[in-house]
Amino acid sequence: HNIRWKDVENEPVFADVWPQFSPLFKGVDFVAAHNASFDRSVLSACLTAAGMPVADERFLCTVKLARKVWPGLVNHKLNTVSGHLGITLQHHHAGSDAEACARIAIEGLRLEPQFAALNVR
């Protein structure tokens, strides 16, 4: 994803920034992520490495949602689903990826509202 050590060597470590971000997760129904099992495992590993309790947030996987709602796509990668929905994406740029994921979740759940009840974990 083109992130090099020199890009981050002077940035704060996870343990220093998590307290600023963790309140954003409180009270939400779920966290949407494209390939949620990966994102959940990275978050858990970072929390464990920082000696912090593992988060219990519920995740909705937009890959699984996209497979359910748009089964005819050639694949269900973030850029493919985004293109299908007309979402502008700067692939592998965190803000753009997050916005695309949110838009996929919104549109997918609009079309399959029961998906969240059965698939948020």
PLM feature spans:
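Acidic two-metal-ion nuclease catalytic site recognized across multiple nuclease folds
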Residues: 104-121
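A short, structure-level motif marking secondary-structure boundaries and short turns
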Residues: 28-29, 62-65, 108
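Acidic, divalent-metal-coordinating active-site segment for phosphoryl/phosphodiester hydrolysis
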Residues: 94-108
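Acidic active-site catalytic centers that drive phospho-/nucleotidyl reactions
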Residues: 35, 39, 61, 97
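Conserved non-catalytic scaffold segment of RNase H-like nuclease domains
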Residues: 1-56, 71-92
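Conserved beta-strand -> loop -> alpha-helix junction used to position metal-binding or nucleic-acid-contacting
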Residues: 53-66
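Buried hydrophobic packing segments
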Residues: 43, 65, 101-105
